[in-house]
């Protein structure tokens, strides 16, 4: 279901982080989409120069997503490209229902993120702060990383996503493997490339204990070598967090020599130069 074609649009613009492709208007509970809920997100995005935004609530809250309400929001805000999205997770309790919902609504969705938040505990996301750190205590960290990236590959192979979210989320609590992370992630990057998927550059890591961009510099450069495309995102759980730390992200992107990011419309990847 992931498209094969890529449209490239060339724009002569100054480096401008114009998109945010990971946002959660519902937060951490079901809240039915309404204009009152969504319009503040568009107002915040516009004020920050973000004119292409994807709403990607967690799939377990798909009951709150209303495509007709998104159409009304687009009519009210023709200057902002508003994408219908979802974040598909590996939650042991809800992922089956989430995948079914994505399949049923694929044609109405513009963009699907894939993520891994669960390891060996079905009752707790490993990235919960601070309690999730307990899942790393006493374990071989290289084994944890290997297990995590195995689950990421399962998500990448699902055929139901366009992009991988916070690719090295496993580092969130600051635990580091003994092996080079590029060795641990190479098989995953090869699959991402083979499946024609993108990787998200997420500023959310800067507000977590690890205090780093997702993914790491090493992984970004490795992905660039493999010509894997990127989206940019804040993983905002409130409208105030949209575009958070984008100035730091701009500096990173400049240092990497990265000059294009991608956006999506009905799962068609559009590469835009910065």
Where are these regions (language model features)?
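Extended substrate/RNA-proximal surfaces in nucleic-acid metabolism proteins
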Residues: 65-195
């Amino acid at each position: 279901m992931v498209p094969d074609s890529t449209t490239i649009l060339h724009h002569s613009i100054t480096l401008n982080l114009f998109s945010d492709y990971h946002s959660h208007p519902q937060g951490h509970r079901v809240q039915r989409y309404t204009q009152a809920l969504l319009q503040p997100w568009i107002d915040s995005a516009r004020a920050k120069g973000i004119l292409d935004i994807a709403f990607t609530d967690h799939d377990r809250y798909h009951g709150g997503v209303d495509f007709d309400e998104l159409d009304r929001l687009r009519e009210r805000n023709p200057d902002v490209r508003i994408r219908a999205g979802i974040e598909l997770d590996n939650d042991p309790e809800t992922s089956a229902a989430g995948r079914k919902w994505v399949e049923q609504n694929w044609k109405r969705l513009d963009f699907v993120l894939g993520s891994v938040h669960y390891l060996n505990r079905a009752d707790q996301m490993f990235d919960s702060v601070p309690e999730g750190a307990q899942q790393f205590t006493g374990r071989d960290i290289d084994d944890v990383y290997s297990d995590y990236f195995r689950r990421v590959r399962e998500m990448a192979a699902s055929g139901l996503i366009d992009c991988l979210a916070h690719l090295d989320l496993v580092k969130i609590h600051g635990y580091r493997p003994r092996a080079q992370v590029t060795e641990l992630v190479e098989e995953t990057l090869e699959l991402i490339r083979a499946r024609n998927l993108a990787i998200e550059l997420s500023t959310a890591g800067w507000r977590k204990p690890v205090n780093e961009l997702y993914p790491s510099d090493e992984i970004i450069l490795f992905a660039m070598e493999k010509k894997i495309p990127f989206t940019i995102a804040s993983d905002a759980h409130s409208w105030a967090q949209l575009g958070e730390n984008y100035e730091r992200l701009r500096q990173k992107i400049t240092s990497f020599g990265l000059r294009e990011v991608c956006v999506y419309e009905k799962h068609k990847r559009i590469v835009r130069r910065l």
